[in-house]
Amino acid sequence: SDRNFLRF
């Protein structure tokens, strides 16, 4: 999901 980039 796009949540993968939310880690930043």
Curated annotation (Swiss-Prot):
Keyword DNA repair tagged = no
GO CC entries? extracellular region
Q: What remark does the entry add?
A: Pericardial organs release this peptide with 100 mm potassium in the presence of calcium.
Taxonomic lineage is: Eukaryota, Metazoa, Ecdysozoa, Arthropoda, Crustacea
Compartments (UniProt record): Secreted
Question: Where is it mostly found?
Answer: secreted
Q: Which residues carry this modification: Phenylalanine amide?
A: 8
Q: Which UniProt keywords apply?
A: Amidation, Neuropeptide, Secreted
Q: What is this protein called?
A: FMRFamide-like neuropeptide 3
User: Native species of this protein?
Assistant: Homarus americanus
